Design a protein with these regions (language model features):
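Charge-enriched, short contiguous segments at helix-coil
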Residues: 1, 8, 288-360
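Charged, non-catalytic interaction/linker regions at domain boundaries
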Residues: 2-214, 229, 333-386
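Charged, low-complexity surface segments at secondary-structure and domain boundaries
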Residues: 130-135, 186-191, 242, 254-259, ...
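The feature marks a conserved, polyanion-engaging helical scaffold used by nucleic-acid processing enzymes
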Residues: 197-204, 208-272
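Alpha-helix capping/termination and helix-coil
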Residues: 230, 234, 264, 278-281, ...
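Residue-level signal for secondary-structure boundary elements
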Residues: 235-238, 251, 282, 347, ...
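Short, surface-exposed, charge-dense and proline/glycine-enriched linear segments
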Residues: 246-254, 265-277, 354-366, 378-387
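Flexible secondary-structure boundary motifs
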Residues: 246-305
Length: 387
């Protein structure tokens, strides 16, 4: 393998063929020979950002489960927003993956004379485990399989196995291995905080909620971004809860699939964000009434009943049909103020005894209690504290 820094391209000479793959991950000083690859699929983790650090016994990290989608990411700005160590392992995983495909799965190559490149490998449920050989050998990976199996990751010998539906929910190893006593506990850690998320929460504290100096159209979109951040937290919590139920045999595979499919809908995610807010709350009632009045004025049909449907409908109008709303900023402002109040209600609920720490982090360099006090001071008391 040879790396061309000027074009950010990996080159692999295979006989008289030259295989290239452009990579946007910054090259590091790691040696390829110090790392190994193993392939897994998971029908539960299919988003590009479902990258998980693999730790043994809660201590040392052996590597990362990196989605195949993320390994093919070309947006350097997006990559820079992810954890440094994830990107280092992805940088190593890219040339190792190229070598594997050239040697073992050439059907993923596109040939043009003596040149060939990798095709876009569209396997969203596939993960590549990039691991340190100093921390785990190939035989060790076999001993980790039962724990990874329990967490919803199924070992496969090659990428193309993912498209074989008959392999789903089966292990490549005998069932008795899966049922053996587990000697090593595997922990999967998802790095929650990227620079972009920290920036988002900082803006949430310092600009979007406390001030209303921007126009209603932009303000609604800003606030919707806040809701989107909460949506990912809510979906992740729901996903882990359902996987736990499945692993404990409390629900069937079909039920699990249905839960994941239903919860992944954007309107359903919004509903999960606000499920702690009573539908009889005056803020909810005002929000729904203002939305319906606004949609009636601009002539847009709507028969939704849930908070999620109302929030999502206005978002779609502003993103896809702004021309319908452009003359009605005053009416939209009533909706924006209600959405602010809904977010504050969400935040109030989140610092109860059943708080979610993800929501109240403003500065990850400070202690959680410091952040919590700052949140209380910043906007739980700033203008909607008394109704």
């Amino acid at each position: 393998m040879k790396y061309h820094s000027e074009t950010q391209t990996w080159e692999y000479l295979h006989g008289d063929k030259r295989v290239t793959w452009n990579s946007s991950f910054p090259k590091n000083d790691f040696y390829l020979s110090d790392y190994g690859l193993a392939f897994f699929y998971s029908p539960y983790y299919t988003a590009e950002d479902d990258n998980l650090e693999v730790c043994v016994n809660g201590e040392h990290s052996i590597g990362w489960l990196v989605t195949l989608s993320y390994l093919q990411e070309k947006d350097e700005e997006l990559i820079s927003q992810h954890p440094e160590w994830l990107n280092k392992f992805a940088s190593i995983g890219t040339p190792l993956l190229v070598s594997h495909i050239v040697q073992n799965e050439p059907e993923f190559l596109i040939f043009q004379g003596n040149e060939c490149c990798l095709s876009d490998v569209d396997l969203p449920s596939c993960h590549v485990l990039v691991y340190r050989l100093s921390k785990a050998k190939k035989d060790d990976i076999v001993s980790f399989l039962p724990q990874l199996y329990d967490k919803g990751f199924y070992y496969i010998n090659k990428l193309s196995d993912v498209v074989n539906e008959s392999l789903f929910y089966k292990s490549s190893y005998a069932d008795n291995l899966i049922k053996e006593e587990k000697k090593r506990r595997i922990n999967l850690k998802k790095n929650v905080y990227s620079e972009e998320l920290v920036k988002l929460i900082k803006n949430l504290y310092e600009k979007w909620l406390p001030y209303s100096y921007i126009n209603a159209f932009s303000r609604y979109i800003y606030l919707y971004q806040v809701v989107e951040y909460f949506m990912e937290i809510a979906f992740e919590e729901s996903l882990f809860a359902n996987i736990k139920k499945y692993n404990n045999k409390n629900i069937s595979k079909n039920d699990l699939r249905k839960h994941i499919q239903d919860d992944s809908e954007e309107k359903a995610k919004i509903e999960m964000v606000f499920n702690g807010v009573s539908s009889n709350d005056s803020v909810v009632i005002d929000f729904k009434q203002n939305v319906k009045r606004f949609l009636g004025i601009i002539g847009s049909d709507f028969n939704g009943t849930t908070i999620g449907e109302h929030v999502y409908k206005i978002r779609n109008i502003l993103v896809h049909n702004m021309r319908l709303a452009i003359d009605y900023e005053t009416e939209l402002n009533d909706i924006v103020e209600c959405l602010e109040k809904l977010i504050v209600l969400k935040l109030k609920n989140s610092i109860s005894e059943n708080f979610n720490k993800h929501i109240v982090i403003c500065d990850i360099s400070e202690k959680y209690r410091t952040n919590r006090k700052r949140m209380r001071k910043t906007y739980v008391q700033f203008k909607y504290d008394n109704g």
